[in-house]
Amino acid sequence: MINLSVGEPDFHTPDHIKEAAKKAIDENFTFYTPVAGYMTLRKAIAAKMKNENGLDFAPEQIVVSGGAKQSLCNVILATINPGDEVVIPTPAWVSYVEMVKLAEGKTVTVPAGVEQDFKITPEQLEAAITPRTRMLLLCSPSNPTGSVYTHDELKALADVLAKYPDILVLS
């Protein structure tokens, strides 16, 4: 059995990262950061996104967090009210369901099997939507399967969602 539930590294922290952490402690660089992250870091991220990914973001558009898990949870907690439904294609990352539970929402899972490359269809999405649906949580590439929705597949899902303007998409 191969456990695909969490992405725990199978390697030790690289020495240069350890040294940078030790240096930060030695230089008393240990206080709370600005909410969006240090501007120098946000500028470096903006430069990286432009140079390596061809994406143009202003540093003011970038928020640094403790990781994707924190950011996803923040969005869910800020937008999901008790009883709201969140549609989640499965298989899915183990933390999604727990985040929705924390917000007192209800998870609506939509099975996506190997025969459809672990991707939901527009028909499945439409069938999962109710008056209580508040969000579609869609991950592409999928965690844990690695499946990637094509442009046409995303467009077909977007066509369904266009009929429901109050449904948020968290991706």
Would you name each region that the model predicts?
Residues 1-67, 74:
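N-terminal small-domain helix-loop-helix segment of the aminotransferase-like
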Residues 57-62, 82-85, 132:
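Short acidic capping loops at alpha-helix termini that bridge into adjacent secondary structure
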Residues 78-100:
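Conserved PLP-anchoring active-site segment centered on the Schiff-base-forming lysine
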Residues 90, 109-113:
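Short beta->alpha connector loops at strand-helix junctions that form conserved
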Residues 102-108:
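A short helix-loop-beta submotif of the ANL/AMP-binding
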Residues 113-171:
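Active-site phosphate-binding strand-loop segment of PLP-dependent enzymes
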